[in-house]
Design a protein with these regions (language model features):
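Short helix-perturbing small/polar motifs within transmembrane alpha-helices
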Residues: 1-60, 66-173, 177-219
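Membrane-proximal helical linkers
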Residues: 165-170, 222-240
Length: 240
């Protein structure tokens, strides 16, 4: 019962923080990047449906991350937050036969909004940009690192509270599964940001095939990882 109350309190804190970030982005609303904003909104929503179940953890991972990071790097705070909100909402919709979990969706959307909002503010921080002008990629690396922490720590915390597992052990497991993906997406975002200056807002379309390939690879890898414990148990049972 105690862990249930703590989980409810934590979800409420994350949800309120997410709404505060969304409200703050509205107050700072600037001119919209119409075509770029709409294209990233649609592409990230489509990519959100390409998701894989994380083995051993109650969660999934989709290939929408680079498009959210691109929005954070190139668009306004409001636009980046909306892209993250829609993307996380679409990702939380279960596949056919599944049951929609509104509380889980609220938590996932709020976490993604917070992560995208903080990353966007870092990327557009004048002091950080001027202090790192000799290393142009440093703000992006810092923003992606913070995005990773803000996105994964709350997930690990809520799993720990609901399942009674050790927080650091869960977070370590999530990091082991997702950190290489975040690292790759940081590189992809850097490349696409540079390409956008040359070919325009259509640049993110170029990485759709790459993300599809990454999705297929992770799906295959995670399916094997999920089957390994069951196979080991079967071998152990056969040896007895």
């Amino acid at each position: 019962m105690k862990s249930s109350r703590l989980a409810t309190t934590f979800i409420t804190i994350i949800a309120v923080s997410g709404f505060a970030m969304l409200g703050g982005s509205v107050l700072k609303l600037d001119a919209l990047h119409h075509y770029q904003f709409l294209s990233l909104l649609v592409i990230s929503a489509v990519a959100s449906r390409m998701k894989v179940k994380l083995p051993g953890v109650d969660g999934n991972m989709s290939v929408n991350l680079p498009f959210i990071l691109i929005a954070a790097a190139q668009l306004s705070l409001f636009e980046a937050v909306v892209v993250a909100l829609v993307s996380a909402g679409v990702q939380s919709i279960p596949k056919s036969g599944g049951t929609l979990q509104p509380v889980k969706m609220l938590f996932n959307v709020s976490t993604m909004v917070l992560a995208a909002g903080v990353a966007t503010m870092l990327l557009h921080n004048d002091w950080l940009v001027s202090a790192t002008h000799r290393i142009a990629s440093l703000p992006l690396v810092a923003a992606c690192s913070v995005f990773f922490l803000v996105n994964t720590l709350p997930v690990a915390t809520i799993i720990s509270l609901t399942e009674g597992s050790h927080l650091l052990r869960i977070w370590s497991s999530i990091c082991h599964l997702s950190f290489p993906y975040y690292l790759a997406c940081t590189g992809v975002t850097s490349i696409i940001t540079a390409m956008t200056q040359l070919i325009g807002w259509q640049a993110p379309l170029a990485i759709l095939p790459v993300m599809l390939l990454m999705y297929r690879c992770y799906r295959l890898y995670f399916s094997h990882a999920a089957e390994a414990p069951a196979a080991a148990k079967a071998r152990a049972a056969g040896a007895q």
